[in-house]
């Protein structure tokens, strides 16, 4: 996003041992690099934008993002790890990784949820889609309860987007980028994305409902 923390930067991940030995020196070298690059102005960092770029420790990065440094989750762990964090650590591109330690963890995560976890999540999303979208949204609109209808519609949209990501075996990103990212998915992404956009723009229009 260009709204914040955007500008020339990159990440260099080191093992814990290398980070302790050469981390400080590499951090100084990174800070000494030109702040602008090919016409892009210097990165404007928000107060909480630190430790996102530069020289980082592999273990600390994964532990901060997903709670573990090895990605060896139990079935319960897979259920509760924040999905947007899984999206964060699997998006983007790794340019060079001759050691392979960083990419090995990333590849485990890119393999996606264990199938039992994926099916459980899909069943949960379908249940909410049915109750919030097919049932309660229509009931609220017929009664003219637009605030309650908007809540139901939001639940339906969130769970529908999540379902499409699960069908594509891709992690759903932070809510600001969910819809835009869904449009790029090969299975139902563009089709469902268009319907959701139309629903979001017209979903609480009382003129379209018989509220008697």
Name each model-derived stretch.
Residues 9, 40, 145:
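Ligand-binding pocket scaffold of soluble enzyme catalytic domains
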Residues 14-19, 143-147:
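A generic structural motif
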Residues 16-23, 206-211:
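Generic detection of long, well-ordered alpha-helical segments
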Residues 19-142:
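Conserved NTP/Mg2+-binding pocket subregion across the NTase superfamily
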Residues 87-212:
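Conserved nucleotidyltransferase catalytic core and NTase-mimicking acidic/glycine-rich helix/loop elements
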């Amino acid at each position: 996003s260009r709204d914040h923390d955007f500008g020339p930067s990159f990440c260099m991940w080191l093992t814990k041992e290398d980070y302790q030995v050469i981390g400080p020196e590499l951090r100084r070298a990174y800070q000494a690099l030109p702040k602008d690059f090919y016409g892009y102005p210097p990165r404007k960092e928000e107060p909480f934008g630190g430790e996102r770029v530069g020289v980082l420790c592999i273990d600390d990065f994964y532990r901060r993002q997903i709670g573990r440094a090895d990605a060896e989750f139990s079935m319960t762990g897979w259920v509760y790890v924040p999905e947007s964090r899984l999206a964060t650590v699997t998006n983007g591109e790794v340019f060079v990784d001759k050691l392979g330690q960083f990419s090995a963890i990333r590849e485990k995560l890119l393999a996606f949820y264990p199938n039992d976890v994926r099916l459980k999540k899909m069943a949960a999303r379908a249940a909410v889609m049915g109750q919030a979208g097919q049932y309660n949204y229509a009931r609220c609109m017929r009664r003219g309860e637009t605030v309650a209808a908007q809540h139901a519609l939001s639940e339906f949209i969130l769970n529908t987007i999540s379902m499409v990501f699960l069908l594509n075996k891709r992690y759903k990103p932070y809510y600001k980028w969910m819809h835009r990212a869904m449009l790029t998915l090969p299975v139902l992404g563009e089709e469902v994305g268009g319907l959701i956009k139309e629903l979001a723009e017209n979903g609480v229009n009382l003129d379209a409902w018989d509220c008697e």
